[in-house]
A protein has these predicted regions:
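Extracellular/periplasmic Venus flytrap/periplasmic-binding protein
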Residues: 105, 150, 157-267, 306-310, ...
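Signal peptide-proximal N-terminal region
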Residues: 45, 67-91, 214-217
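Beta-alpha junction/loop-to-helix N-cap segments that form part of ligand/metal-binding clefts
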Residues: 33-35, 59-63, 81-153, 162, ...
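Segments of small-molecule ligand-sensing domains
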Residues: 321, 327-328, 343-398
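Short, low-complexity disordered leader/linker segments with a strong preference
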Residues: 1-46, 77, 417-420
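Extracellular/periplasmic periplasmic-binding protein-like sensory domains
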Residues: 264-335, 404-419
Length: 420
């Protein structure tokens, strides 16, 4: 992938448009339009973004749509798609309403409207349906947030995922806990694992168990629950307290993970830490406001935007300045997804979806989320360099703490729940 695509991540954020034009080695028309490197006459290139803009997940969905637009603006402010004569990138959004059926129909609509690629969708069930539509129509689909392993186990050729899948997050979460314990000099011999019993929670648990076995960590007790029905976690946390586990690991959504934290505050088990794994609460600013004692000391091993990356920080600042609220990691992943698509269009020099698909498969985009290297897709479409980072609530702020080379502050471990 060329230098121009890599630099786009900062374009429109740090005002690098003129530098980009010089570095790309080609003249760029700010107005867009012209003849492509393949002889196409193109003024605009349409891509589609599918997210829940209404419904219970609308807060995330709207942020993701906003970030997609910021990415498109950055590309266009840097001169558009140079290999297509400076053509403008145009974004059309689709509201999945948080349901797979609506997501499927919206994906079909966007493709019929001429979208040459899709990004989305925040929810695995919806992404599974969109992936099927993308495959049938041979239009590339880059998933920003969708953890379910099975989506990419269908032999699809047109679907790609940026984030780590659920089982990989479980594996990396266990490895991170073991490494943190070793680094701190505080042994962790036994972990209690509490997880929501759906496909996501089960996959995270299975990955965690496998990696914990390799690290010599006993996982016991293992407790599952129905995230849609649970209203109190006192019984489950009492079981954890009776087990003598050193650490409680939790893989759940926001509401149920908050219930677990409330039960920990009530039962007060003797723990070295509460350690979220791909957790939907413990790295969220809202958790600090909602949790007992502000959730002080809670960890989460999860994908997250990289606070040590200047371009990521610049995007976060631009987002808050533009929309009046802090950016969420889901939105940064959407920004990355659009940049991968834009870079592929640039590389392909074509609006042919199959040519764009081939360029996506060969991308080496440097993401703004924490990663083990440039985006690199395997034959299933999974980003093999997707990774997690450990966050911790410190002094009423979610802070990036481990591994040490990515830390914005030293971790605190042991960290008894609620202790300052």
């Amino acid at each position: 992938m060329n230098h121009r695509m890599r630099a786009w991540s900062g374009a429109g954020i740090a005002g690098l448009a003129l530098t980009l034009a010089a570095c790309s080695g080609s003249a760029v028309s700010a107005a867009g339009g012209g003849e492509s490197s393949t002889g196409e006459s193109v003024d605009e290139v349409l891509i589609g973004a599918l997210h829940p803009l209404t419904g219970s997940n609308a807060a995330d969905g709207q942020q993701m749509a906003n970030a997609a637009q910021l990415a498109v603006d950055a590309v266009n402010e840097a001169g558009g798609i140079a290999s297509l004569g400076g053509a403008d990138l145009v974004l059309e959004t689709g509201d999945t309403q948080g349901t797979p059926e609506t997501g499927q129909s919206e994906a079909t609509r966007l493709i019929e409207d001429g979208a040459v690629a899709l990004v989305g969708t925040f929810q695995s069930g919806t992404s599974a349906n969109v992936a099927s539509v993308a495959e049938r129509n041979q239009v590339p689909f880059v998933m920003d947030v969708s953890a379910l392993d099975e989506i990419l186990e269908q032999g699809y050729q047109y679907s790609f995922r940026l984030q780590p899948n659920a089982s990989l997050m479980g594996e990396q979460g266990a490895a991170a806990l073991a490494a943190l314990a070793e680094d701190s000099g505080t042994p962790v011999d036994q972990v209690a694992f509490l997880y929501e019993q759906g496909n996501y929670g089960a996959a995270v648990y299975e990955g965690f168990q496998a990696a914990a076995d390799e690290a010599g960590i006993t996982v016991d007790p293992v407790i599952s629950y129905d995230a849609t029905a649970v209203s109190d976690m006192t019984t489950q946390i009492s079981q954890v307290a009776a087990s003598g586990a050193d650490v409680l690991a939790v893989a759940g959504y926001y509401r149920d993970s908050l219930l677990a934290a409330q039960a920990v505050d009530t039962v007060k088990p003797d723990l070295q830490a509460v350690f979220g794994v791909a957790n939907g609460a413990y790295d969220q600013p809202a958790f600090v406001a909602d949790a007992p004692s502000g959730g002080e000391g809670y960890f989460d091993a999860n994908y997250h935007w990289d606070v040590t990356n200047p371009d990521a920080v610049a995007l976060a600042e631009l987002y808050e300045e533009t929309y009046g609220e802090p950016i969420r990691t889901s939105a940064v992943l959407t920004y990355d997804a659009v940049m991968v698509v834009a870079g592929a269009i640039e590389e392909a020099g074509s609006t042919d979806p199959t040519a764009i698909r081939d360029a996506i498969a060969d991308t080496d985009y440097e993401p703004l989320v924490v990663s083990q290297g440039p985006v690199s897709f395997d034959e299933t479409g999974q980003n093999t360099n997707a990774g997690i980072v450990v966050m911790q609530v410190q002094d009423a702020a979610v802070t990036q703490v481990f591994p040490n080379e990515l830390a914005e502050a030293p971790y605190r471990f042991p960290a008894a729940p609620g202790a300052s």
